[in-house]
């Protein structure tokens, strides 16, 4: 279980994990921390009485850690894993190898994903932009795998790229085994500190992600051989409506991970990542 907070000018985030579990879309809590070269909070961290076993609060622009609790403990991240998936997607968009209007075809493997999903059918096509919304708003495991395969050919190759990116970011206590966080394998883990690193990288390099992560509800259209029908995406991050200034980022939950969240919110003078 992880709680992570991110901060940046005019932005604040908060997250917490409890002892409950769920295989469906749920609120989640996650953590984040900065590299050794970044400014950190004083050694004496006050006890805030938080139930979450791992927590980190960061000011996003400077990377200053404002609060942390067991931020270096390895834990199962659940769907917070998708933050790295989104980071790689936006890097492809930046390079021009991917366009928001490109169509992505859902494979049988992507279609077979359980847990939180948007119920894509095998052979169904959706634009990259719609897939991004499905991932960050509804936490769609099927959409995550479809995008991974579209970019790298196979999910396993995409996961290799995720782990390479983690190394580049100094996420030394992180290892990914899938692109969506559905697995509860002991070999799939991260820390609040590492979640903070990848979350900060995503929102600082690609602030447009917040235009998607702040969506509360939006309708997409499934178009398959069965016909066309609407489907409503609802944000799994309830902080979007329950915490003033919250604009993201990603929740996650499995029976092992419990509830996790990496949250981003705006403050009067700073934005924070939790």
Residue ranges and their predicted role:
Residues 48-50, 54, 154-274:
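Penicillin-recognizing serine hydrolase domain
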Residues 6-7, 62, 111, 270:
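Generic "edge-of-domain/loop-turn" microfeature
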Residues 15-193, 203-204:
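Active-site-adjacent loops and short helices of periplasmic peptidoglycan-processing enzymes
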């Amino acid at each position: 279980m992880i709680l992570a907070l991110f901060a940046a000018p005019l932005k604040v985030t908060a997250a917490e994990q409890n002892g409950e579990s769920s295989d469906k879309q749920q609120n989640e809590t996650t953590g984040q921390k900065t590299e050794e070269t970044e400014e950190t909070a004083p050694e004496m961290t006050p006890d805030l009485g938080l139930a979450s076993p791992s927590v980190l609060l960061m000011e996003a622009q400077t990377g200053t850690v404002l609060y942390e609790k067991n931020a270096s403990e390895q834990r199962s991240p659940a769907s917070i894993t998708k933050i790295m998936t989104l980071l790689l997607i936006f890097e492809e968009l930046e390079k021009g190898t991917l366009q928001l209007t490109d169509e992505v075809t859902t494979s049988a493997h992507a279609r077979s994903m359980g847990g939180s999903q948007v119920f894509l059918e095998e052979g169904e096509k959706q634009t990259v932009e719609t897939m991004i919304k499905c991932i960050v708003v509804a936490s769609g495991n099927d959409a995550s795998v479809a995008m991974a395969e579209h970019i790298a050919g196979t999910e396993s190759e995409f996961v290799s790229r995720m782990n390479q990116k983690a190394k580049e970011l100094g996420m030394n206590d992180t290892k990914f085994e899938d692109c969506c966080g559905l697995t509860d394998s002991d070999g799939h883990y991260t820390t609040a500190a590492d979640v903070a690193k990848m979350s900060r990288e995503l929102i600082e390099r690609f602030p447009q992600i917040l235009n998607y992560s702040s969506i509360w509800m939006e309708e997409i259209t499934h178009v398959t051989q069965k016909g066309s029908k609407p489907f409503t995406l609802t944000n799994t991050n309830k902080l979007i409506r329950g915490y003033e200034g919250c604009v993201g980022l990603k929740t996650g939950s499995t029976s092992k991970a419990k509830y996790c969240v990496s949250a981003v919110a705006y403050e009067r003078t700073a934005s924070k990542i939790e």
